[in-house]
Amino acid sequence: MNGNKSLYPIWLGVLGVALLAGLVAGAFIFMHGHVLFNANDVLIWTLPLGVYIFLALASSGLTLLSALPLVFGIKKFEPVAKRLVFLAIATLCGGFVSIGLELGSIFHMIYILLSPNLSSPIWWMGAIYSVELVVLAVKFWKMHTGDYHSSFSKFLGTASFALALVAPLMIGSVFGLTESRATYFGPLMSIYCLLMALLSGTALFILYSMVVERVSGSGSAGEHHAVIDDFCRIFTYATGIVMVFTILRFIMESATTIPAFLAYHQFAHSFGAWHGFHFEVVLGLFLPFVLMLVPSVRQSTGGKVVTSSLILLGTLAMHMEILLAGQSHPVGPKAEQFPQYVQYVPSLWEWLVLVFALAVMLLLYTLGERYLKLNEAPTG
């Protein structure tokens, strides 16, 4: 982001304030634990876990997009391959910041590493994403040194693609295998997470590309413009597919008489749902899809920024809606001391975890764009 040097120190200052606030929040969370979160015996997964899911899936989506040139050999996408890999790394780092603070203690992170549970989808989720981060880092280093086409570099590209396919499926299985929670259970959750990964990753790359183009003051070259247009097509298709899955999910939920779903229809949360009406789906999924069908919106920089921003906000809210709805209806002995469904509003500390994770991610974006020559394309 070299084009507008006067804004660069201001931007770094904003990130510095956000990082400082996040570090203070992290210190308090590690000292006092989950008592700082608005969690309870029923609702134990809150905003920090939702942020982790959102960023981890977006990272997987970016990795899947990078496979177009690196695995499938589509050369027109090679100029953006290095940037895609780096964005995947930075986004996943932000996700790890959020999940690290969600655990409430740094000793919990060490304990997970030292006591693997091979029968736990949650452990496999963390293990796969940890391996994916290492593979992506090595792949980026190989690309940074100009090695795109050696056998080892191609192996890393294929491995990262495979991990990016499996990781969202594993996140979905964390919820889909939970038989005691009807709103989680089912095989479609893994497929839904994979589609959401592709959608949010594509939206993030389009938004980032438009911002970099604007800040750097460089207009899109013909080839780069064509690549962004192709990503916009992928973005539109992914939005449409996720929209169909979402509609089918609503239809199935509305036809059931399972108590958990009946309570779910009355559930309201601070991320867009109110008495069964999901504003986050309408504004964060349906509206962007309609806008992307309009050629003038789809081809304009402002249209790309607005639609991709709406999708990112919408997908985060949709992740939170699914996460909270599955816990909102107390079951077993807990049903005797709690209301029919439990409400949730994030605490200040949870919002600071979100700020910290995004600040780490954006700082890595900024430094990478400035010093790591992310617009390099392979030669030969």
Residue ranges and their predicted role:
Residues M31-L36, F107-I110, S254-L262, S328-E336:
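Peri-membrane helix termini and adjoining interfacial loops of integral membrane proteins
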Residues V14-H34, V97-L103, V166-F175, Y365:
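Alpha-helical transmembrane segments of multi-pass membrane proteins
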Residues F28-F30, L49-Y52, W123, M189-C193, ...:
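Membrane-interface transmembrane-helix boundary segments in multi-pass integral membrane proteins
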Residues N2, Y8, V14-A21, K76, ...:
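Long, contiguous internal "core" modules enriched in hydrophobic/ aromatic residues
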